[in-house]
Amino acid sequence: MEKFDRKPQIADIPPKMVKKYGSGKMLIPSPRDIDEIIRSVGKGRLITQEQIREKLAEKYGVNITCPMTTGIFISKIIALMAEEKIRKGEGDVTPYWRVVGKNGVLNPKFPGGVEMQARRLEEEGHKIIYDRKPRVKDYQKYLVK
């Protein structure tokens, strides 16, 4: 829980990231902020990690949100906490499986890998295209705004 409640931080965009993102300010988000956004994604809907980062950057008035920490917090804190609640039979679970990558690609770093994410998404009515990188068919139609 300590890591979940860490405070967001704002820093200069590191020199090694300036070429890709430009100079300015970068948010190192809190898992709680990310969790709130994921919880707002209703059944049958999807959100990309990029959308999460954009929403947080706008909320905090910065240029970008750190892509690395966002991904780590989703797969290593939020998803694991959700799975623990599911295992214990508790309600109020963050639907982390609704977070997809670029082009609707499933996340192999989630608990249970792409297989579990695919199963949960299929249970919510999504069709999965199983190829080299499994992804949600027509994912753009289901993205939150």
Residue ranges and their predicted role:
Residues 1-145:
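Nucleic acid-binding interface residues in structured DNA/RNA-binding domains
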